[in-house]
Regions:
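Short glycine-/acidic-enriched loop or helix-start segments at secondary-structure transitions
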Residues: 17-19, 42, 106-108, 128-129
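Acceptor-binding helix/loop patch of EC 2.4 sugar-transfer enzymes
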Residues: 57-73, 113-153
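Soluble or luminal CAZymes and related metallo-dependent hydrolases
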Residues: 11-12, 74-82, 98, 102, ...
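Membrane-proximal helix-turn-helix segments that form the acceptor-binding/catalytic region
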Residues: 83-93, 104-108, 112-113, 125, ...
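Short, solvent-exposed loop/turn segments at secondary-structure junctions
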Residues: 13-15, 37-39, 101-104, 122-127, ...
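N-terminal subdomain of nucleotide-sugar transferases
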Residues: 1-52, 87, 91
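Active-site donor-binding segments of glycosyltransferases and PAPS-dependent sulfotransferases
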Residues: 36-95
């Protein structure tokens, strides 16, 4: 029996490096896709790391724009660009593990190619988080940026289309 090829994808830091190192130590890591490889994170075979840097720079540039929508727009643009560009690296995965909001398009392709898909969420359920933040914004007389609704909808679409959802928290 062939060893499953695991592809881990994360545009952010989170704990993705630990996940990738764990998969590598078991002989399963086929590829680790990330926005920018952090050199202080050691222990990964460099030949298994794919960097997709442009989305991170686009996101940083947008977040520097003044206004309440900038941060939400930076997530929307950066994560969607990362997701779109990372698709080319998931075709040969047997298991595709991606972090929430960074993988709807790549997840769809991986599934079409026969991979088992896992979406990981590092926070509260998106609907709960959306409701909580909307209430908090209102308490302070602020308007919750409408762009966050689009982000929320993508989170839910990833959940609906993935085979498994992983939450590494009890929150």
């Amino acid at each position: 029996m062939r060893i499953p090829r695991v592809v881990v994808s994360s545009a952010g830091v989170f704990h993705a490096y630990h996940l990738a190192r764990g998969a590598q130590s078991g002989g399963y890591l086929h590829r680790f896709i990330t926005s920018r490889y952090r050199r202080e994170e050691n222990g990964l075979e460099r030949s298994r790391v794919v960097q997709i840097t442009l989305p991170e720079y686009v996101s940083l540039a947008i977040s520097a724009v003044p206004g309440e929508q900038a941060r939400a727009l930076s997530y929307y643009a950066g994560d969607n660009m990362y997701d779109w560009l990372s698709r080319r690296y998931v075709r040969d995965a047997d298991i595709f593990h991606v972090f929430n909001h960074q993988g709807l398009y790549s997840l769809r392709l991986a599934k079409r190619e026969g991979a088992i898909t896992i979406v990981e969420r590092s926070s509260a359920h998106p609907t709960y988080q959306h409701e909580l933040l909307t209430e908090e914004y209102e308490k302070f007389g602020l308007r919750y940026p409408s762009t966050y609704r689009v982000l929320h909808d993508k989170h839910l679409a990833e959940y609906a289309e993935s085979d498994y959802i992983m939450v590494a928290s009890e929150f």
